[in-house]
Amino acid sequence: MIRLALFDLDHTLLDGDSDVLWCDFLIERGVLDATDFGARNAQMERDYRAGSVSTQDFCAFYVSTLAARPRTAWEAFRLEFLDAVIAPRIGPAARALLQRHRDDDDLLVMTTATNRFITELTAGHLGIEHLIATECELDADRNFTGRPEGMLNMRDGKVDRLQAWLAQRGLTLADCDATFYSDSINDLALLAAVQRPVATNPDAQLAAVAAERGWPVLRLHGTGRTA
């Protein structure tokens, strides 16, 4: 049986939300309008934490930030974003957890609702070879259209995308001893689908579910979220 270690990114391995931080970063650089995107970004984060935003609206809003420039123009931005914003927010406890699973010869997979363009450098930085993320639509010139593509990797979609990823390798979840680390009630479907769910820095709703179901709770940074 394959040992699978699945990791959500935002508020789990990362102390923060990479979508929200990306918007803030682009606003600070003058790429996005502070009045428009700043308010919408803050509201989207609140709605996501409450579990009240639709998967389509959430993913579409953040992917839309990539429509402002040609794809090649984003490379310098995302490299700076990784170095200046993301890497400092991934603490030693998260890195030690990843290393422990490597030492156990587990197959490491990052699964995130955030789009691939933003998160693939983070996965590489952490030495996670496999990434399941929301995909971005490209036009004929290979530039971002500002729309997500295919099945969104959020809520039930995380289960479906994982199953599809496993099927490409001739596997099913039944073939795996799977552990999944997540902070969010939005990931309840995948947490319930694996053998070893771990509520990690859980939001209030997930903490309540974890207590009810007897799931372990792990703190990787700070004292955990309360909203």
Each predicted region: which residue ranges?
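Active-site neighborhood of HAD-like aspartate-dependent phosphohydrolases
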Residues: 1-50
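C-terminal cap/substrate-recognition subdomain and adjoining C-terminal extension
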Residues: 2, 76, 83-227
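Conserved active-site and cofactor/substrate-binding residues in soluble primary-metabolism enzymes
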Residues: 17, 69, 157
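Active-site phosphate-binding/coordination module
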Residues: 18-25, 71, 135, 152
